[in-house]
Amino acid sequence: MTTSIIYVTVGDQKEADLIASKIVEERLVSSVNIVDSVRSYYWWSSAVQQKEEFLLIAKTRTAVVDAAIERIRDIHSYKCPCIVSWPIEKGNKDYLEWIGRETEGTGIR
């Protein structure tokens, strides 16, 4: 079993809480950390934009990443949201196994 991190930015606390609660409740991820007051700079509409955002860091099995990303995309309010993932190479074995157990309910192998 391999595990991954999903990194997501959102515009406000309400949306962060909504996405986090939905994807945990639906067992697409084992847990989500929410970090507030992340300052983002990006190019949009032919200009540099700056916005205070919230960061979600979700943990899941790699096999579930595509389904989790799709679900986050369905809920997310942005036209082009930042939703990216990368594998966890190493970590606390007990924690990584817990991630696997908590996301088995998805039926995705």
Q: At which residue positions do the language-model features occur?
A:
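Positively charged, small/polar-rich N-terminal and surface patches that mediate targeting and assembly
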Residues: 1-109
